[in-house]
Each structure stands twice: as structure tokens, then as C-alpha cells.
């Protein structure tokens, strides 16, 4: 690979071919550059973990085009997430749902859950559309190191260990997405990021009884 390529109809088609063939594509998201593989291909996930030097017990987040794709990944969607999807999607809020039993264990990290979000960034959604389904969205970094915020940084980090770097300009960096889950029927914050957990609580509080909070 000679370097990052601009996002065009042709490069998106090429990226989709790579992903469908089990390859790895770096692409921009609303926070950092991410690494996309087909989340349903175990071999592609193995390669993703090798590229990132990622510990095997850490799950991988997934981007979807909208709630209609949740059934491909989640065994069920907690009712507490309904107002959150309406208020914060598309946006940097990852919802951790019970995972379908047939998902690769590399994706879930044997947690029994899967984290999903819908990106507001056009380039990310164009890639999902070109690939025809959800994509992994783990940050473009070596495990434990800062993520890439530009295509040039992603290329410098990975070079030929990824198959394509899509250049969508600089990403904001800073905090990652906020992760929320439900435990014993109660909303919980697994990682606070761009979206304040207080705003998440307020959203659900305005639609339901306050008891679901922890």
C-alpha cells in the first residue's frame, strides 16, 4: 500500500471488497480513526487482534447504520436504550447489549455482550453502506497507545499490516465514545466519554421512573 487514499465511490468499493475478503481497513469516525473488519468473520477478527496487538479478552465495538441492524448483533435490546437511541444516535454513545449466541467470541471477548453505536460521520456510514452491514470500529492504535487522529498517523502506525487507509481528514480526537449498559435492570456507565453520563441519565429519567439508575 502506497499510502492513504481519498474517500471516493471507487475507494469505498475497494474498501468493501477488502472487508468482504477478510481484510482490514482504517477509516475515520466521529472520535478517532478506526479499524474496520467484518464482525461476523472469525478469521478477520483474529487478524484485527494481531494488527492491534490487542489482548484476547477485550471485546470489539461495532458500528451499525441504525437500529434496524441491531438484531444482527444483539439477542435483545434493553428498553432503557430506546430513548437513548432517539436522543443520542447518531453520535458517540455505545450501547452494550446482550450478544447473540452465534457471534464470534473474539468480538464479544467472552463477555456475552456486544457494544454498538451509530456514527454521525458520513464517511463511516458510507463505508457501512458499501460493505452492506455492520463493521468493527475499534480505534486505530496499538493496544495501550493513543489512537490515530489522521489518516497519515494511521498509515504510520500500521503501514502494510492493514489493507487500506481511507483519508477523511483529521478527526476530533479527545475522548472516545461513552459506553453504557444495563445490569440487573439498572442503567450503568461502563466508560464515560464524549457524552456525559449525567446527560444519559437525564434522557432516560425524562422517559421513565428514576429507579433504573445506579
Residue ranges of model-derived segments:
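Active-site-adjacent structural elements in enzyme catalytic cores
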Residues: 1-214
Amino acid at each position: 500500500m502506497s499510502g492513504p487514499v481519498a474517500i471516493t465511490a471507487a475507494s469505498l468499493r475497494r474498501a468493501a471488497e477488502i472487508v468482504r475478503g477478510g481484510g482490514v481497513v482504517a477509516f475515520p469516525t466521529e472520535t478517532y480513526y478506526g479499524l474496520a473488519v467484518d464482525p461476523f468473520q472469525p478469521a478477520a477478527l483474529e487478524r484485527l487482534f494481531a494488527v492491534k496487538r490487542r489482548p484476547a479478552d477485550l471485546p470489539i465495538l461495532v458500528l451499525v447504520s441504525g437500529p434496524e441492524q441491531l438484531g444482527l448483533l444483539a439477542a435483545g435490546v434493553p428498553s432503557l436504550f430506546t430513548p437513548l437511541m432517539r436522543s443520542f444516535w447518531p453520535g458517540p454513545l455505545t450501547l452494550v447489549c446482550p450478544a447473540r449466541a452465534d457471534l464470534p467470541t473474539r468480538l464479544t471477548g467472552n463477555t456475552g455482550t456486544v457494544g454498538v453505536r451509530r456514527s454521525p460521520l458520513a464517511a463511516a456510514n458510507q463505508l457501512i453502506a458499501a460493505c452492506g452491514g455492520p463493521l468493527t470500529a475499534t480505534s486505530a492504535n496499538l493496544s495501550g497507545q493513543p489512537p490515530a487522529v489522521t489518516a497519515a498517523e494511521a498509515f504510520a502506525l500500521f503501514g502494510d499490516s492493514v489493507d487500506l487507509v481511507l483519508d477523511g481528514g483529521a478527526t476530533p480526537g479527545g475522548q472516545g465514545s461513552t459506553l453504557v449498559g444495563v445490569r440487573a435492570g439498572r442503567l450503568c456507565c461502563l466508560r464515560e466519554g464524549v457524552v456525559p453520563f449525567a446527560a444519559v441519565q437525564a434522557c432516560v429519567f425524562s422517559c421513565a421512573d428514576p429507579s433504573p439508575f445506579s
